[in-house]
């Protein structure tokens, strides 16, 4: 028998999927890829709660007698019976070809047949196996082999840490989904997370002093009942100061409004539903037109050290998003999430219309590593910032940390300073910083290339 060649060692020898659980206790898909060399890669996919309508389809069984319809046995079966036979024997380093083959096998525009959760699990596991076989870190493999960047120096990511949860991510009466802190005054990942941890615990102390609950939402942030966004922002500013930092200089604030969640398609108005249901808002006053919503967001940026606003308007309100970006985009990062759903074609439309100046990147919105990288590159070519993101239903998989560093996106949002599925990503970023040493750069305020932030 002849010895295996170097190329043969990268061939996929085995591939299988199985069911695991996400951070909300619902099933999700895991995949293991084994190569001829004996190296393996394993990936687990996340799941979102507030999902954009244009996202690739997360395949669920729909059987009400099993996991209330949220089982993933069909997605697992699709990997084991449909995808695996076609991929075994292929070279794991040919990521683009493998992803293209899975897209072809699915044959639908939104991966509805095999499921984006099935396809993504395989896509990520293949990359991890290939990195392992090349005896290199995943971020280096992605940067130099998959993206062809040939890099030795990397940009570490400024984290957006979700310290107050609302919207679809918490059982409280806050309509905005995420209130985040960005430690922009730090000079390293280690210092950034120190600042974030201290602010997080200062906020917890403040909430207790005010008699507000400190229960956590899906992403590890606190989920108190508050009357308005302003109350959450006041608490954040006070917590930043209590931790010994300067709001708007050391630490700035980022919002994920997730406005699609309270946009009424019939009336074309933004109805602050959770607050109204709790009878803390006047229904007439808090049913806002697009112009009123933009004015409200502008007012918030004038009153608080806000540097970034995600999904400030509905994913259906393209004209409004263009106006929002024209109004605030010179000094504020305007991020599109539901608007684009990490879809390269939709991202290109956004660039043409100047709908935002930044894009949120979620692997499971599009369903393959190759398409995700394409969306990142479209944003880079347009001089937009890119924010790599987790989902509210997460696992201990840390791929997004490696992807953020590999693509030098400069920003990541992956939850608060609690819940181990969130902390796992931050710990991975610390490992990467340690591995890179002097070849790692934390940009802080310089992460914003296309806006002129107004620092305090």
UniProtKB/Swiss-Prot annotation:
Its main location: cytoplasm. Its EC number is 4.2.1.11. SMART domains: Enolase_C (SM01192), Enolase_N (SM01193). GO terms for biological process: glycolytic process. One of its GO terms (molecular function) is phosphopyruvate hydratase activity. (2R)-2-phosphoglycerate binds at residues 177, 362, 391-392, 413. The keyword Cell cycle does not apply. It is an enzyme of class 4 (lyase). Binds a second Mg(2+) ion via substrate during catalysis. Mg(2+) binds at residues 256, 310, 337. One of its GO terms (cellular component) is cytosol. It catalyses: (2R)-2-phosphoglycerate = phosphoenolpyruvate + H2O. Its cofactor is Mg(2+). Pathway: Carbohydrate degradation; glycolysis; pyruvate from D-glyceraldehyde 3-phosphate: step 4/5. The active site is at 219 (proton donor), 362 (proton acceptor). It is found in: Cytoplasm; Secreted; Cell surface. Gene3D superfamilies: Enolase-like C-terminal domain, Enolase-like, N-terminal domain. Keywords: Cytoplasm, Glycolysis, Lyase, Magnesium, Metal-binding, Secreted. The keyword Lipid metabolism does not apply. Homodimer. Catalyzes the reversible conversion of 2-phosphoglycerate (2-PG) into phosphoenolpyruvate (PEP). It is essential for the degradation of carbohydrates via glycolysis. 'Moonlights' as a plasminogen receptor. Binds plasminogen, but no fibronectin binding was observed. Plasminogen binding increases bacterial adherence to host cells; plasmin activity leads to degradation of host extracellular matrix proteins, facilitating bacterial dissemination and disease spread. Belongs to the enolase family. PANTHER family: ENOLASE. This is Enolase. The lineage of its organism: Bacteria, Bacillati, Mycoplasmatota, Mycoplasmoidales, Mycoplasmoidaceae. The gene is eno.
